[in-house]
């Protein structure tokens, strides 16, 4: 009997194909059981949704599972490809996700990643942590980097907690200053 579980890797999929190797030729390897594990962040459920329509309830359940499959240590936009922490997920999806989940810890961690990735000139790259350094619009897009300003504000709006704003205020000002340095007549038009 052999049991194996990856410790540092996850992959989203609908189907899984298993091939075996390394056993004696002509001897069939018997696979007794394969079990997949659904892993995601431990954000606490704080709200629920149900209605009288079973189809709508099932759709909500599928969406809820899809959302959770994109929560590891960062919010990703898909669990089956690069799994990078694209920042727009925080501020565009954050408000709707907060109806069902307590995202304070996950978002505080995301803000720490953004702070760690902020450049000396104030730029907040489009992904955090920045494992891959992209160029141009895939690294410097205001609609992604603005998560650094919007997420603390949303946290305050939802919880009344000013801690993220206090902790990240200087970096937020640096990012807004960076955007100002790229603006023409006070209009940001790049990205």
Question: For each of these PLM feature ranges, what is it?
Answer:
Residues 1-80, 88-89, 105-108, 121, ...:
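Extracellular/oxidizing-compartment recognition motifs
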Residues 16-21, 88-118, 149-165, 172:
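Alpha-helical support elements that line or immediately flank enzyme active sites
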Residues 178:
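Structured mid-domain segments that build the active-site/substrate or prosthetic-cofactor binding neighborhood
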Residues 186-191:
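Flexible glycine/proline-rich, aromatic-decorated loop/lid segments
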């Amino acid at each position: 009997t052999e049991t194996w579980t990856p410790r540092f890797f996850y992959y989203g999929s609908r189907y899984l194909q298993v091939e075996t190797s390394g056993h004696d030729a002509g001897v069939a390897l018997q696979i007794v059981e394969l079990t997949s594990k659904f892993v995601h962040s431990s954000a606490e459920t704080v709200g629920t949704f149900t209605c009288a329509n079973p189809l709508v309830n099932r759709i909500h359940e599928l969406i809820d599972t899809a959302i959770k499959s994109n929560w590891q240590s960062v919010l990703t936009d898909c669990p089956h490809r690069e799994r990078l922490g694209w920042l727009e997920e925080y501020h565009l999806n954050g408000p709707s996700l907060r109806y069902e989940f307590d995202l304070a810890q996950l978002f505080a961690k995301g803000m720490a990643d953004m702070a760690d990735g902020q450049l000396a000139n104030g730029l907040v790259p489009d992904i955090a942590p920045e494992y891959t350094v992209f160029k141009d619009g895939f690294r410097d897009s205001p609609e992604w980097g603005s998560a650094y300003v919007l997420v603390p504000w949303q946290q305050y709006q939802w919880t009344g907690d000013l801690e993220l704003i206090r902790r990240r205020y200087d970096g937020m000002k640096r990012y807004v200053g960076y955007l100002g340095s790229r603006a023409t007549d006070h209009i940001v038009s790049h990205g």
